[in-house]
UniProtKB/Swiss-Prot annotation:
This is Transcription antitermination protein NusB. Involved in transcription antitermination. Required for transcription of ribosomal RNA (rRNA) genes. Binds specifically to the boxA antiterminator sequence of the ribosomal RNA (rrn) operons. Belongs to the NusB family. GO terms for molecular function: RNA binding. GO terms for cellular component: cytosol. The gene is nusB. The keyword RNA-binding applies.
Amino acid sequence: MSRRQARERALQILFQVDVGGADPGEAFRLMDEGFGELKKYQEFARLLVGGTLENLAAIDRVIAGVSKDWNINRMANVDRNIIRMALYEIFFCEDIPYSVSVNEAVELGKTYGGEESGRFINGILGRIVESPEEYRPLIKGSAS
C-alpha cells in the first residue's frame, strides 16, 4: 500500500461520513480492518480523516472563499471531499509539498469523480496554493 492508496481509503471514509452519515468512530474501525500490517499508511489515512473532520468548518470556509459562485453543498460529493482532504494537507501537513497535495487530489478526482472533476479540483486548489496566506486567516483557530 502506498500513500496514494491511503488517501483513497481516507476519501472513502470522508465520503461515508459526509454523504452516508456514518459515525466517524465506526468508519475508522472499518478503515482499520483493511490495513493489516501496514501501520505506516494506516496512520497517514487516520491523520487525513481525523484532521479533515476536526477542521471541517475552517476548511469549508476556505472553499467558500474561493468558490464564491458555488455553494459547497452543490459541489459533487466526491469532489468536495477530495478538496477538503487536500486542504487539510495544504494547511496542516507541512511535510507535504503543495504540489504533491494538489496532484494527488487531481488524480483522485480523475479516478473517483466525474469527467470534469480533475480540472475543477485543480482550479480550486490552484487558486489557494497561489496565495495560501490569503486563506490562512480562515483556518486559524479553527477546530470545529
